[in-house]
Amino acid sequence: MDVKISAILLACIIQYAVSSPIQVFYSGAKILAEEDAMAKEDILKAIEKADPGSVKTQDSMDILSQILEANKGIKLQTQEGDIIQKQGRSAINDARFLWPKSADGIVPVPYNLSYSYNADQLALFKKAIQEFEALTCVRFVPWTTEVNFLNIMSNGGCGSLIGKNGGAQRLELDANGCMNMGIIQHELNHALGFYHEQNRSDRDDYVIIHTENIIPDFLKMFEKYNTNNLGIEYDYASVMHYSRYHYSINGDITIEPKPDPNVPIGQRDGLSILDISKINKLYECNVCSNLLPYSNGMMISANYPSAYPNNANCVWLIRTPSGQVTLQFQAFDIQSSSGCVSDYIKIYDGPTKAFPVLVNRACGTGLIPLQIASTNQMLVEFVSDRAVTGTGFKATYGSIQCGGAFYSSPKTFTSPNYPGNYTTNTNCTWTITAPAGFKVSLRITDFELEIGASCRYDYLNIYNSTLGAVMGPYCGPIDFHSAIVSKSNSMMITMNSDFSKQYKGFSATYTFVR
């Protein structure tokens, strides 16, 4: 019941959005003219593929536990579990051990990857460094001829020196135990100059170290260092933080947050909000960036609902723990201009501007339709000039298990695993948006969902009017003899399944018609 009500409310929002005035210039700008071009310019493909970033080794462990497990029985000489020993350094307090900044404000960090990694691992490494690129002035770039670079190897274990040490600087990422999004970012953070969070000079104000529960040989791992804390608060959520049971001799906690002992520590998903802030502070990055790493939340422009500032150039990286990112605007007021050349929002299907564009430029006073990414990452860019401003925008983000957003025609899409059986507890959303003056013609060519009274188990709904009216729910084997045509230029399809029986699902094709 709750799912159905939520879907109806979402449909109402979407239908209101597409009926409001807005200038949106999608990457498929020729969509009105040529249907062949439309297919090539699809903004977002509804794909279901293995996302390298979502595959976690030893998933029940936090990052540091995985590192220690990977380092068992190897000859990598480390301190604190994964910091490769080199005498007499406190890099974060010494500018000599920071990577130099170029004239354009970028901090290039060359790296060389050994031949030990397979294609999936290389893709995962690239995904891990893309967050640094999106949110900081640090750029991990392939090594060419630079004297100082990171020499990344798979010789067993996970480990890094602190900061720039010169020459071919060793960084260990074992192919079998360390190729995890959070571990990669953790070791790269060491190479940028960061220690473990619980070794900060002010850590006693935030955690209690229970030395009585620590294996005696590992007490040194919990020493405090004379660190430069950059004026940034202690970060329990840091990718650099130990978990509460690290090096426990008796199964009792070794690190207890205070004053609230239940605060989560030792997360393994990746860089935290404050991790990003620390990098930008340490390297004096002149960037406007925001990380949104939660399952759901809100994204607003600066000063909203007051006018946003002139000469803004900001990005928001949405990184949900799983699924595909969804973004729904609730308010939108960006200075209007021909072609949205002055102030605009641009949305990318991935963590950097190198990824496919979902919305090329948007301005005006309407609402952008629901956006759905193909993975758990979406980048939003906002640019303003030095002249007129508006009140900005307000949007909510979340995630779905499957679905897509389509802007070109014709297109065929299916339920997950079709023609195989769909999975249990599926919750999918597809949105189709035609150009102004066009409608969506949907033809369901094959359909079989679990049958039940009032379709209460598995069902498909179609939302196709300006009032958000729903067609459905549909279930069982059905032969759809004719096409379903929307009453406006948009349509939304949702599919839900419960925990019991599964069937092959559906296949559907749509076109745009006048």
Swiss-Prot record:
Q: Does the keyword Metal-binding apply?
A: yes
Q: List the disulfide bonds in this chain.
A: C137-C285, C158-C178, C288-C314, C340-C363, C402-C428, C455-C475
Domain named Peptidase M12A is located at: 90-286
The record's annotation in PANTHER family points to: DISCOIDIN, CUB, EGF, LAMININ , AND ZINC METALLOPROTEASE DOMAIN CONTAINING, EMBRYONIC PROTEIN UVS.2
Annotated active site:
E187
Q: Which residues are glycosylated?
A: N112, N199, N421, N427, N464
Q: Name one GO biological process term.
A: proteolysis
Molecular function in Gene Ontology? metalloendopeptidase activity; zinc ion binding
Name listed for the protein in its UniProt record: Embryonic protein UVS.2
Record's cofactor remark: Binds 1 zinc ion per subunit.
Q: Which organism is it from?
A: Xenopus laevis
